[in-house]
A protein has these predicted regions:
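A positively charged, amphipathic N-terminal helix/segment that binds anionic biomolecules
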Residues: 1-113
Length: 113
């Protein structure tokens, strides 16, 4: 289906708006940042936990990068939510196109009788 065949409606506008938000997200990183206790230290250490090829891995995060890595993981969660929104609006556009085509075919069939 070419883009010109899609009539602009609320789903098209919402999808375009969400795509613009995705473009502004910035750096992202999949995983969870978790503190762990270090012997003899009052401050916790930090690990990034993530899945790779079906296995869980952890990566030590130096203290000077913790704030930045937290932001990256938050950006990743936000990105996933935005992708779900784009998907929902794209499915709605497909559903609307199919419904419009069925209605047009139905009215043609009634007119030809």
């Amino acid at each position: 289906m070419n883009p010109s065949a899609i009539v602009s409606n609320r789903h098209t506008r919402a999808r375009e708006s969400t795509l613009r938000q995705i473009a502004r997200i910035g750096p992202f990183l999949e995983g969870s940042l978790s503190p762990f206790k270090r012997l003899g230290c009052t401050q916790p250490g930090w690990h990034l936990t993530f899945k790779q090829h079906g296995r869980t891995h952890t990566l030590y995060v130096p203290m000077e990068l913790v704030a930045e890595v937290k932001q990256w993981t938050l950006n990743y969660r936000r990105l996933k939510a935005l992708i779900r929104q784009v998907t929902r609006h794209s499915r709605a556009l497909i559903h609307r196109q199919v419904a419009n085509r069925r209605a047009a075919n139905h009215s043609k069939a009634l007119m030809s009788r």
